[in-house]
From Swiss-Prot:
Gene3D superfamilies: Dipeptide-binding Protein, Domain 3, Periplasmic binding protein-like II. SUPFAM superfamilies: Periplasmic binding protein-like II. It holds the Pfam family SBP_bac_5. It comes from the Bacteria. Keywords: Periplasm, Signal, Transport. PANTHER family: ABC TRANSPORTER PERIPLASMIC BINDING PROTEIN, PERIPLASMIC BINDING COMPONENT OF ABC TRANSPORTER. This is Putative binding protein BMEII0691. InterPro entries: Peptide/Ni-bd, SBP_5, SBP_5_dom. It comes from Brucella melitensis biotype 1 (strain ATCC 23456 / CCUG 17765 / NCTC 10094 / 16M).
Length: 614
């Protein structure tokens, strides 16, 4: 399950991290003055003269190599277009594990704050107090890997070409920009229109790449390619074996190596990413020492299968990391574009039939915790809390959007006796399906059109198939016929992109600063946009209104209320059958690899690790 979540992180980097920090002002008294950082809400943690992020080791040796494995395949080095959105090699840009090795952004996000950006390609930033415009001054030292300077023209070109040929969300962002203008030799200003919001300047700064105008062919940009790209990042592509391996080499002339936001990162001379068909072969390669680290997501394996000699000899080290962000949402996703899942009562009924207690005990050694909220384990979660006055005000125009038990904070997923045969949730599911017009004849559930109730769960790994089989067994007790179809990675990505499935296991990374990415997950406008993350096909005015409210919030209290209100609407919509999460992050490593002592709020950070051998 861990790698399934990592995949979605690598495709679309989402906001991370949590809690409040010391009171260092993000700006001078004049908020429009150029500065070194931007914060979404409140203050930033680090002063203007900070030397490095506190979760890095600025004295880490720069040497050696890191070899890691991932499950899947790739056929492109272009992460910015729809055609190769989900088949691009890992590590190039916006990768949840490896960061931005080749392409960079104007500013870099700290992984130890809710949503704060620090100088990178832009050495200074100025912003209007109302966030109607933002202006960046480029670092004069910024260079592409071929030695050419990074210029304002590159920034202008990036927005032009991504609007014309880029994938979501890049292609739609210019719709919020009234104008982009060159205001100096190294400065560029974005002025926003009425479609913008308070978060949008942060996205311009921290989640839009800057591309080299001189090195990109506009006519072919929309195609997949295996040509090594020119970037401004710390690594260049050294070699490529399509679908099997990509090797990155640290650029010895990297322009930003002495920036405070870069010190302690990018310590390996070479990083190799090896592709495997499944986790079993990947784990065997790790045991043999072919791979340096193994990111573990299987509690049974973590508990029972690390008994090989290298572990006993202390050559392989098992690390446990705690993070401060909400747990990721993993669940069975109903594709509500399919008529069989259009009725919320049907989705609610099927949600009652997942037996977490049995699965956790029998499949996962009791290691998992049940996920209930889309912001599980954080102050943004609505679970266990009655809606406050501000939430009720936001939800008032949408009567019926939130179930009463969700509104008053008493809702929770069903808790079974763990036997695998608990009749209480089954009876509730039976009643809901009956209310929705289903009948039960000869051991089969018959839908309102007179057809047997049947659907497919699409999976892509043995781990996914295992939990789908457990769910299938429970559904069959009510006469629901479920077929589990495991497909290869290429077919999975294609069907995912075109929403060609009944049900999948979906994963969403969560943060304490949700924002515009919520439109791509839940917004009505994204329902039929290929490449969006609206896997459930949500199109609900109440959802849209809550997203607008969280983006318009000017203080933390209003923001929290808006997110909780969105959480309540999503839970009440029964779009996901929430599954489970691990309370920790597990990584096994050979002793030649080391990491900093401090773990930031978002968890371990591979770009800050290093090689220890002589």
């Amino acid at each position: 399950m861990n790698r399934f979540i990592a995949f979605f992180r690598s495709v679309f980097l989402i906001g991370l991290v949590a809690t409040a920090f010391g009171a260092l002002p993000a700006r001078a008294a004049n908020e429009t003055a150029p500065d070194y950082a931007l914060s979404m809400h409140g203050d930033v943690a680090l002063p203007a003269d900070y030397t490095h992020f506190p979760y890095t080791n600025p004295d880490a040796p720069k040497k050696g190599s890191l070899t890691v494995g991932v499950v899947g395949t790739f056929d492109s080095l272009n992460p910015f277009v729809l055609k190769s959105m989900r088949t691009t090699a890992r590590g190039l840009y916006n990768d949840g594990e490896f960061g931005n090795m080749v392409y960079q952004t104007l500013m870099l996000r700290s992984r130890d704050e809710p949503f704060t950006l620090y100088s990178l390609l832009a050495e200074k930033v100025a912003i209007d107090p109302e966030r109607k415009w933002v202006e960046f001054t480029l670092n004069p030292k910024a260079k592409w890997s071929d030695g050419q300077p990074v210029t304002v023209d590159d920034v202008l070109f990036t927005y032009d070409i991504l609007t014309e040929k880029g994938r979501p969300p890049y292609n739609s962002r210019m719709s919020r920009v009234a104008k982009i203008e060159k205001t100096g030799e190294r400065s560029v200003r974005f002025t926003f229109n009425e479609k913008s919001d308070r978060e949008f300047p942060m996205l311009i700064a921290g989640s839009m790449p800057v591309l080299p105008k001189h090195a990109i062919n506009r006519d072919t940009f929309g195609n997949s390619t295996l040509e090594p790209p020119i970037g401004s990042g710390p690594y260049v592509v050294a070699s490529v074996q399509p679908g099997q391996r990509i090797v990155y080499k640290r650029n010895p002339d990297y322009w930003g190596k002495d920036l405070p936001s870069q010190r302690g990162f990018n310590n390996f001379d070479k990083i190799s990413i090896e592709y495997y068909r499944n986790e079993t072969s990947l784990f065997e390669s790790f045991k043999k020492g072919i791979l340096d680290i193994f990111i573990e997501g299987n509690p049974i394996r973590w508990e029972k299968l690390y008994d090989f000699p290298a572990v006993e000899q202390g050559k392989v080290i098992k690390d446990t990391f705690e993070k401060g962000t909400p747990a990721d949402m993993l669940g069975f996703v109903f594709n509500t574009r399919r008529p069989i899942f259009a009725d919320r009562r049907v989705r609610q009924a099927l949600g009652l039939l997942f037996d977490f207690e049995w699965a956790n005990s029998n499949l996962f050694a009791g290691q998992y915790r049940r996920t209930q909220s889309f912001w599980e384990g954080s102050q943004l979660s609505s679970v266990g809390r009655p809606a406050d006055a501000r939430e009720r005000e936001l939800l008032a125009p949408f009567p019926g959007a939130v179930r009463e038990d969700v509104m008053n904070g008493t809702w929770h997923p069903p808790v079974t006796d763990g036997s695998g045969h608990d009749r209480v949730p089954a009876k509730k599911a039976y009643d809901l399906l009956s209310q929705a017009g289903f009948q039960f004849k000869d051991g089969m559930a018959i839908d309102p059109t007179g057809k047997p109730f049947a659907f497919e769960i699409m999976t892509r790994s043995p781990d996914e198939e295992k939990i789908a089989l457990a769910y299938q067994r429970n559904l069959s007790r009510l006469g629901i016929a479920v077929e589990i179809h495991t497909v290869d990675d290429a077919q999975y990505q294609q069907r995912l992109q075109t929403f060609d499935y009944d049900m999948i296991l979906g994963a969403l990374a969560s943060s304490l600063s949700p924002g515009n990415e919520q439109w791509l997950r839940w917004g009505s406008a994204s329902r039929d946009v290929q490449g969006s993350f609206n896997f459930a096909g949500v199109a609900d005015p109440a959802v849209d209104a809550m997203i607008e409210a969280l983006l318009a919030a000017r203080n933390r209290a209003d923001f929290v209320s808006a997110v909780r209100a969105l959480d309540r609407v999503l839970i009440s919509g029964d779009y996901y059958v929430p599954l489970y999460h691990l309370p920790y992050q597990w990584v096994a490593r050979w002793d030649r690899i080391e990491h900093p002592q401090k773990t930031p709020l978002s968890g371990y950070q591979l770009p800050a690790w290093w090689h220890t051998s002589q």
